[in-house]
């Protein structure tokens, strides 16, 4: 959530 890094 907030970033697209490993679907967070």
Curated annotation (Swiss-Prot):
The record's account of tissue expression is: Expressed in the CNS and thoracic perisympathetic organs (tPSO) but not in the ring gland, midgut or abdominal perisympathetic organs (aPSO) (at protein level).
Subcellular localization(s) per the UniProt record: Secreted
State the similarity comment: Belongs to the FARP (FMRFamide related peptide) family.
Q: What does this protein do?
A: FMRFamides and FMRFamide-like peptides are neuropeptides.
Chain ranges passing through the membrane: none
Single GO cellular component term: extracellular region
Does the keyword section mention Nucleotide-binding? no
Q: Keywords for this entry?
A: Amidation, Neuropeptide, Secreted
Domain of life here? Eukaryota
Q: PTM Phenylalanine amide: at which residues?
A: 8
> What is the official name of this protein in its record?
FMRFamide-like neuropeptide PGQDFMRF-amide
GO annotation terms (biological process) = neuropeptide signaling pathway
- Keyword Secreted present in the record's keywords: the answer is yes
């Amino acid at each position: 959530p907030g970033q697209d890094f490993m679907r967070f």
